[in-house]
Design a protein with these regions (language model features):
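Active-site histidine-anchored catalytic micro-motif
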Residues: 29, 41-90
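A charged nuclease-like catalytic/ligand-binding cleft shared by nucleic-acid processing domains
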Residues: 1-49, 87-126
Length: 126
C-alpha cells in the first residue's frame, strides 16, 4: 500500500460586510497526485492491481488512461462511507462502498511510518 497524502493550503477570508475574518484550509493537488501515482504504478508494472479509495470523478481520466496503456492491470475503486459515485461503473474492474463499521476493523497501525521516515499518528477521535 502506498498512501498518497494531500496538501492543504491556508486561506484567510474576510466578510465584505463586517470585515470579520476566518481561516479556511483548501485541499490542493491530491487528485492530481493520486492520478500521477496510479499511472506510475500501472505503467511501470509495479502493481498487478491498483485500489483507489476515493469517490472523486476527477480520477476517471487517469483510470481510463491506465486501462488503455495497461489493460492487463486490474483497477478497483473503494468508495469512502457516503461517497459512492455511479460514474465509476464500467471504468474499473471492481467498485464497492466501504461501510462505516469497516473503518474500525481495518485501520492502519498507529503510528504509520512512511518510506521517507515521516510518522503519521492517528487522531485520538478515531
Amino acid at each position: 500500500m502506498i498512501p498518497q497524502l494531500g496538501q492543504f493550503k491556508c486561506k484567510d477570508l474576510r466578510c465584505p460586510s463586517c470585515g470579520s475574518g476566518v481561516r479556511r484550509y483548501e485541499e490542493k493537488e491530491t487528485d492530481v497526485a493520486v492520478a500521477a501515482k496510479l499511472l506510475e504504478l500501472v505503467v511501470t508494472g509495479a502493481c498487478d492491481t491498483a485500489m483507489i479509495v476515493s469517490g472523486e470523478t476527477d480520477l476517471i481520466p487517469a483510470i481510463r488512461t491506465a486501462r488503455r496503456l495497461r489493460p492487463d492491470k486490474k483497477l478497483c475503486v473503494a468508495f469512502p462511507h457516503g461517497r459512492a459515485n455511479d460514474a465509476f461503473r464500467g471504468e474499473v474492474h471492481v467498485c464497492f462502498k466501504i461501510r462505516a463499521t469497516q473503518y474500525a476493523r481495518f485501520q492502519l497501525p498507529d503510528p504509520v511510518v512512511l518510506p521517507d521516515g515521516q510518522t503519521i499518528t492517528k487522531p485520538a477521535s478515531w
